[in-house]
Each structure stands twice: as structure tokens, then as C-alpha cells.
């Protein structure tokens, strides 16, 4: 195979990979496996300065960068307590009523130290991150 043929083959493969849709990330309740959020519902935040951001009494003395123990999402229809007029409350799974996280319209601090406002927090320990092929028919209503 000549250099030109190899180059064309590499270009063809890379353009083919770029045209393929990325796998979609779904977040499911660990207890009942219902989909509670998809990648498009995630509200990104800049990681904070770790322990420096917390009050002195909350610090553990560990100087390493802390990973986020939660994901933050936009408000969604299944979050019944936000429609009941509450300012802050637990977020319960609409399938099994298991506790998935917490919300606060005034905001809350992530474990990495960043402040997220308003905050609809899902604990990573209570949800599973699942990758799947994109489905154009899947639409999580917000």
C-alpha cells in the first residue's frame, strides 16, 4: 500500500467516525433503573478550588482536588416537589420514590467547591451512568 493510499484510507476513516453520532449518556435510578436524565439535561459547572471553598469546619485537610460527587441537571417534569412550590427539598425518583438528590432554588455548593445556582443535584452514588446508541425518539421532557 502506498503512502497516498494509506493517507486516503485514514482520512476516510476519520471522516466516517466524525459523521457517526456520539453515544448518548443516560442516567438511571440505581434502584428501579428508570431514566431520570440524559446528557443534554446536565448543567455544567467549573470545578471549584476544592477544600479552600468550604468553611473551616467542613475541611478535612486533604489538599487533593476533589471529584464531583454529584451531577447538576435542569429542572424536569418528573421532579414533583419543585412543582409543589418548595424552595428546597429532596429529589425522589418518580418510579420507586427512592432519594436521588436534592434541589435548592437558591443554589448549593458542589463537593468540588463550585457554587451552582439554582441547584438540582443528583448524587452519583444513587444513579448509574449508561452509554447507548443515540435514539432520536428519546426525549426527556424538561
Curated annotation (Swiss-Prot):
Belongs to the protein-tyrosine phosphatase family. Non-receptor class dual specificity subfamily. This is Probable inactive dual specificity protein phosphatase-like At4g18593. It comes from Arabidopsis thaliana. The lineage of its organism: Eukaryota, Viridiplantae, Streptophyta, Embryophyta, Tracheophyta.
